């Protein structure tokens, strides 16, 4: 069967076509350049860009897959959580395609799509596994017991990890998005140059606000109202020290969750899963503890529609479908 997936939860306009669980096309149009000058995603601009780009992206996905609208057996779209205006664009388009072609429609939870994304390239993952969902809007640990059964073990109490990266990048006068920039600078810095805290060491919840405050306090020593940021501040060392603190926390809690639940497989999902230090450290920790680590390739870490199509396809196989009066929701627990 052919599934069209649509993703517009934040600032990526994406469409993909799958034949069963095989990706035939996966198109992503990023808005990063548009939001860069504002230091973050502007919801109104994001919605307008989705309106402008979605149909061309859908057409490209269908053309690349050599699939016509009349051949589609299912349309799936992210309906929660995310920016409400952005979600509305994708959900409305998906429902229109479904209604006009009398095609089943399924609304997909963005978080569920992320924690299933690794199955695109690794269909043999099996269950159960521990999923670390880590991105600009989410940081949470799930015990994925089987498809459709996800037990949250812990989540962030304040900033998501990706959000903390963006805020620290702003403190250092670095461009948005901050994650890739800090990751790159960190490779040339010393991770032990600055003593930074590791938040909420007990349990499975996360906290990055204390870490962010510690970085702000350090950077403030090198900033003046008149001259701005002092060139003596070593941004590479700050980046490396900050990244080490984040990665230490993510790795330790994820491995602890696997050991606590007796789970032998870990999956990392979300945009921050593309971070080079996180991938390296998690590989080392997994090998040390005899745990299988499954890492999606970069194209399936970022927001994409292939993971949405896969999730919709799996729900459809269970006989599920959504009503056409389904509304997008800005927040929704998994």
Regions found by a protein language model. Give the residues of each.
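Short beta-strand scaffold segments in enzyme catalytic cores
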Residues: 13-18, 131-133, 139-143
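Conserved phosphate-binding/catalytic loops in two-lobed NTP-binding clefts
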Residues: 107-108, 283-307
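N-terminal beta-alpha supersecondary unit
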Residues: 2-81, 110, 238
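Short Gly/Thr/Asp-enriched flexible loops that form oxyanion-binding sites at enzyme active sites
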Residues: 77-102, 120, 276-284
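Conserved phosphate-binding catalytic cores of ATP/NTP-utilizing and phosphoryl-transfer enzymes
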Residues: 103, 108-130, 311
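Glycine-rich phosphate-binding loop plus the immediately following alpha-helix
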Residues: 123, 145-188, 212-213, 217-223
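A contiguous, well-structured pocket-lining segment that forms one wall/lid of small-molecule binding clefts
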Residues: 68, 184-266, 276-289, 316
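Glycine-rich phosphate-binding/hydrolytic loop that grips phosphoryl groups
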Residues: 115-116, 296-334
